[in-house]
């Protein structure tokens, strides 16, 4: 079929398999260009490995450290009438390139919140790897099916206490709007913590530990974002922030357990990037377009893959073997460049000035849109989008 982008809300409902493969290859090449990671991990489980920071973690482990990787994700293959999800094609491309270099790669396509996902991962680790020395937890899901009761719990992207009003961009119409979001109820806050908090990370680590598949010295990391006062009302001080604070709680509990065998658990606070997850958060697209322009001008711009490479080589797996620098809450901070005062001051100055007319001039909004489409395999140089492509891509994946 000939596949063109179709946007609905903050999701592109079509994907291009050749474009997704090109994205993965680009990340692999960036990783290889940085050279091998000294003392890097060798057997890595990535929970949430099909896009964004999770995909970049799998790529960095494999192509920066020659690691065997097991990826867990929830994606859809193509049907007769529509292409598969971007994460399906990303994972297929990763599998193809990893195997071409003789690297172990297996994937599990299922609900990562389920008991079955954990049991299947343990089974494959025991059969193929013995143990893992790194576990990356990178799930971003709006819904969690509780594994025992089967109840569906939904997260909310809402402020707490009072309505949130702010300048934002309507990414469908490309105009500046005043966004208004009603505050979360107590139930919505609790539900967001249930979906996006640290409980499932703990359940994964507990299951892996009880099965004896965590190597001594195993490191685990989960991803978070804190941001600044520009995004705090909707993010860190909102329902999502409460969930991310619960991730901090889980990290401390896990670190206490893992440190007994020389391991560690950390939350890594990462910079804002264009992902399917961030595009759903009110105000984030405008903030990202603004902060990217300034960071590019200062030579500080990083995408997912650059961030994760820096986390591996300059935090968790330093060449000299020294311990990672952490903040007062034992977090790895990779948002350090974004939070520089001159970067944030620029955004504070720009915010009241931006209009629909000067949006493209004052910010990198055009680039934001291009990067958003790239997530789904579109707008990539060198690809002929008039070509007929086969949307049916198979790879080494266990679907349960």
Swiss-Prot record:
- Active-site residues (renumbered): 235
Against InterPro entries, the record matches this protein to: Eno_Rdtase_FAD-bd_dom, Enoyl-CoA_Rdtase_cat_dom, FabV-like_NADH_b, Trans-2-enoyl-CoA_reductase
Gene3D superfamilies membership:
NAD(P)-binding Rossmann-like Domain
User: What pathway does the annotation place this protein in?
Assistant: Lipid metabolism; fatty acid biosynthesis
Give the GO terms filed under biological process for this record. fatty acid biosynthetic process
Q: Which residues bind substrate?
A: 225
EC annotation from Swiss-Prot or TrEMBL: 1.3.1.9
Q: What class of enzyme is it?
A: oxidoreductase
Taxonomically, the superkingdom here is Bacteria
Q: Which residues cross the membrane?
A: none
Alphabetical UniProt keywords? Fatty acid biosynthesis, Fatty acid metabolism, Lipid biosynthesis, Lipid metabolism, NAD, Oxidoreductase
Where NAD(+) is bound, by residue?
48-53, 74-75, 111-112, 139-140, 244, 273-275
> Keyword tRNA processing, does the record have it?
no
- What is its quaternary makeup? Monomer.
Say which family it is in. Answer: Belongs to the TER reductase family.
Question: What functional role does this protein have?
Answer: Involved in the final reduction of the elongation cycle of fatty acid synthesis (FAS II). Catalyzes the reduction of a carbon-carbon double bond in an enoyl moiety that is covalently linked to an acyl carrier protein (ACP).
Q: Which HAMAP family match?
A: FabV_reductase
Name of the protein in its database record: Enoyl-[acyl-carrier-protein] reductase [NADH]
User: Gene of origin?
Assistant: fabV
């Amino acid at each position: 079929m000939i596949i063109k982008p179709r946007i609905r809300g903050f999701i592109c409902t079509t994907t291009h398999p050749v474009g997704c493969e090109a994205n993965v290859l680009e990340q692999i090449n960036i990783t290889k260009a940085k050279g091998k990671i000294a003392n890097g991990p060798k057997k890595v489980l990535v929970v949430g490995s099909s896009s964004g920071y999770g995909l970049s973690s799998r790529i960095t482990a494999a192509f920066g450290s020659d690691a065997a990787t097991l990826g867990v994700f929830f994606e859809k293959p193509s049907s007769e009438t529509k292409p598969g999800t971007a994460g399906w094609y990303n994972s297929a491309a990763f599998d193809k390139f990893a195997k071409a270099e003789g690297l172990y790669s297996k994937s599990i396509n299922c609900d990562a919140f389920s008991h079955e996902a954990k049991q299947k991962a343990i089974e494959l680790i025991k059969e193929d790897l013995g143990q893992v020395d790194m576990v990356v937890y990178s799930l971003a899901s709006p819904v969690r099916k509780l594994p025992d009761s089967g109840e569906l719990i939904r997260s909310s992207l809402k402020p707490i206490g009072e309505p949130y009003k702010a300048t934002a961009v309507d990414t469908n119409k490309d105009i500046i709007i005043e966004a208004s979001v009603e505050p979360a109820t107590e139930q919505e806050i609790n539900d967001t913590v249930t979906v996006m908090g640290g409980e499932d990370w703990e359940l994964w680590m507990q299951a892996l530990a009880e099965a004896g598949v965590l190597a001594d010295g195993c490191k685990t990391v989960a991803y978070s974002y804190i941001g600044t006062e520009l995004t705090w009302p909707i993010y860190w001080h909102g329902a999502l922030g409460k969930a991310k604070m619960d991730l901090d709680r889980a990290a401390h509990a896990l670190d206490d357990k893992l440190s007994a065998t020389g391991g560690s658990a950390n939350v890594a606070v990462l910079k804002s990037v264009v992902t399917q997850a961030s595009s759903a958060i009110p105000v984030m697209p405008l903030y990202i377009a603004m902060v990217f322009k300034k960071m590019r001008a200062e030579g500080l711009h990083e995408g997912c893959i650059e961030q994760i490479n820096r986390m591996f080589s300059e935090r968790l797996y330093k060449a000299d073997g020294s311990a990672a620098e952490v903040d007062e809450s034992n977090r790895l901070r990779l948002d350090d460049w974004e939070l520089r005062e001159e970067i944030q001051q620029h955004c504070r100055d720009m915010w009241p000035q931006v209009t629909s007319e000067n949006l493209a001039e004052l910010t990198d909004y055009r680039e934001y849109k291009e990067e958003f489409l790239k997530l789904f395999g579109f707008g990539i140089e060198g690809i002929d989008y008039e070509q007929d492509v086969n949307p049916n891509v198979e790879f080494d994946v266990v679907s349960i």
